[in-house]
Design a protein with these regions (language model features):
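Active-site-proximal segments of catalytic enzyme domains
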Residues: 18
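Nucleic acid-binding interface residues in structured DNA/RNA-binding domains
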Residues: 1-15, 24-138
Length: 193
């Protein structure tokens, strides 16, 4: 399993809240990645970190939600998030999707908020010291410098990919690691939006 960044934890916590809202409001109906981000933004309209999030980077945030649920013996709330094309969870999802969705819909999520805060704090404490957050402008400048000297490696990078790379660099990754993570997410999740 890859290491979570501060960005994964912050956005993952917001996605958790949106998924709980989705589970309650729709009895466990699936929600596409892009719509999930939109729902989370509507619940937290002033959250700048969430505002920068893009569907291509949603995989690690959902893994954070999944890890939280698994650590407390809850149904996998992340199973509600689905790919726009396949209408199914990402290829890394293991389990009986229909049964998991029913379990998510029946579960009482009311008492989980405090546990999420505690889990997020302990996960933040486990983030390696080398993952030092930086501001958006320095991350953008560093990405541009990397992009200019590695154009061939960056040939398939879209505008949405670039935004997630900047998000990851703001969370402390170097440009090469951020690019590798985004390309791996594209391979794993395909067209996530």
């Amino acid at each position: 399993m890859r290491q979570f960044t501060y960005n994964d934890i912050e956005v993952g916590s917001r996605l958790y809240e949106a998924l709980v809202h989705q589970a309650r409001a729709t009895a466990g109906a699936p929600i596409e990645y892009g719509d999930l981000l939109t729902l989370a933004r509507s619940l937290h309209p002033k959250d700048a970190v969430l505002g920068r999030a893009v569907p291509v980077g949603i995989g690690m945030k959902l893994l954070f939600v999944e890890a939280f649920c698994a650590s407390h013996g809850y149904p996998n709330l992340a199973c509600l998030a689905v790919n726009k094309t396949s209408k199914r969870p990402g290829p890394g999802y293991k389990g009986d999707w229909e049964a998991e969705r029913r379990a998510v819909a029946r579960f009482d999520w009311n008492a989980t908020d405090l546990q999420l805060s505690t889990f997020a704090a302990s996960t933040r404490a486990a983030v390696p010291a080398r993952f030092k957050p930086r501001k958006e402008r320095p991350a953008d400048v560093a990405w541009y410098a990397y992009f200019c000297s590695h154009r061939a490696a960056c040939a398939q990078v879209t505008q949405e990919d670039k935004q997630e790379i900047i998000n990851l660099m703001m969370a402390g990754l170097d440009p090469e690691s951020a690019l590798e993570r985004v390309l791996a997410a594209k391979d794993e999740f395909g067209s996530a939006s």
